[in-house]
A protein has these predicted regions:
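Sec-dependent bacterial lipoprotein signal peptides
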Residues: 1-19
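Bacterial lipoprotein signal-peptidase II cleavage site
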Residues: 18-37
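Short helix-initiation/N-cap motifs at beta->coil->alpha
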Residues: 47-48, 103-111, 244-256
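A short, structured surface patch at a secondary-structure boundary
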Residues: 59, 65-113
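Alpha-helical, coiled-coil/dimerization segments enriched in small aliphatic residues
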Residues: 85-88, 216-251
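Proline-aspartate-enriched helix->loop->beta-strand connector
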Residues: 114, 118-124, 260, 265-266
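Extracytoplasmic substrate-binding proteins
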Residues: 139-211, 313-328
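Structured C-terminal subdomain patch of bacterial secreted/periplasmic proteins
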Residues: 259-328
Length: 328
């Protein structure tokens, strides 16, 4: 899926995804939403704005899928979600309630729909169309969460999760998710070392097609996926490609088939797609002589669909499991 860079568990669901790294213990076994409290909560969002809520936010909406994953992972089912069909295609780490209302696109939610939901808070990123945040704030508290930070992608994920947890009164669940992620990474790294795969060179990407043109999107060292690869001890092959630039938020680059020739010959080439999406590498490029001549193309691996590359700890644990299984 194309996540533009200019503007890119419930407890039960998490437990179901953690078999590969032996991290099925979930300290947050209660799927019920946090109880309402009369104590006000004051927090500071990504804008530096101080926001005071009457109590833990329960009736909430989110415009970006990372926030939706955070909420469900923390035991809070959002009542409003942008592009529900897309979310369920691209992120299967958590299960969204069928009662959720679609509030429009991620970049431009429907203000009319939001106004009908009687919300305690709306979580957004800074990628909304100009003026949208101010309009939403006329009726509902808005909490702005950064999309990412290529300087510290994993650290930003935790900061985001902690902000959402603070607003919803679910800090204990957030701590449990951090423990599960750390355990998954430690177990994964041990498994890779046992298999002799630690330190392998990996080029991870996705791709999208417009007409006859295929754009390949490298996930650099500053991407969330790149950060997890580094935690597992892999070498990011894209870091060796001269002149390849990455955006400062999501750590993503752009190249084409010709650009792949600059990757080290010993690279493992991994990529991801969405359920039901065209596979540019296996389909469109299957008879492309340049692609098929690359030493790693014959062994290119499509990881399991619907691991959301810009998600939270639930998605990243899925990625750890997939990476370990693929490399071992």
């Amino acid at each position: 899926m194309r996540h533009t860079t200019a503007s890119v568990l419930s407890a039960v669901a998490l437990a179901a995804t953690l078999a590969a790294c032996g991290t099925t213990d979930d300290p947050a076994d209660d799927d019920e939403a946090p109880e309402s409290s009369a104590e006000p909560i004051t927090l500071t969002d990504a804008r530096g704005e101080e926001i005071t809520l009457e109590g833990p936010a329960v009736n909430v909406a989110g415009t970006e899928w990372n926030v939706i994953e955070y909420l469900i992972s923390l035991g809070v089912q959002p009542v409003g979600v942008s592009d529900i069909e897309g979310f369920e295609k691209w992120n299967n780490s958590v299960e969204l309630s069928p009662e959720a209302t679609d509030i429009g696109t991620r970049g431009e939610p429907s203000l009319d729909t939001l106004a009908t939901l009687d919300l305690d808070a709306v979580f957004v990123t800074d990628q909304l169309v100009e003026g949208a945040v101010e309009q939403i704030e006329e009726n509902t508290p808005v909490i702005v969460v950064p999309g990412g930070d290529a300087e510290d992608p994993i650290g930003q994920m935790w900061d985001n999760l902690d902000l959402v947890a603070q607003a919803t009164g679910t800090e204990d669940r957030a701590a449990g998710l951090r423990e599960q992620f750390d355990e998954a990474v430690a177990d994964g790294r041990s498994a890779l070392a046992e298999a002799g795969a630690e330190g392998s060179t990996v080029a991870f990407s996705d791709a999208y097609q417009a007409g006859e043109t295929i754009t390949i999107r490298p996930f650099g060292e500053g991407s969330l996926i790149g950060g997890v690869l580094a935690e597992l001890g892999f070498v990011n092959a894209w870091g060796t490609v001269e002149g390849l630039e990455f955006d400062p938020v999501y750590g993503l680059g752009a190249t084409d088939v010709e650009g792949l020739a600059q990757l080290p010959d010993d690279s493992a080439f991994w990529y991801i797609g969405g359920a039901g999406e065209t596979d540019p590498f296996a389909e469109t490029l299957s008879d492309n002589s340049l692609w098929t001549s690359l030493p790693f193309s014959a062994d290119a691996v499509r990881l399991p669909d619907s691991i959301w590359m810009f998600g939270g700890p639930a998605s990243m644990i899925q990625f750890v499991d997939a990476a370990v299984e693929t490399a071992s």
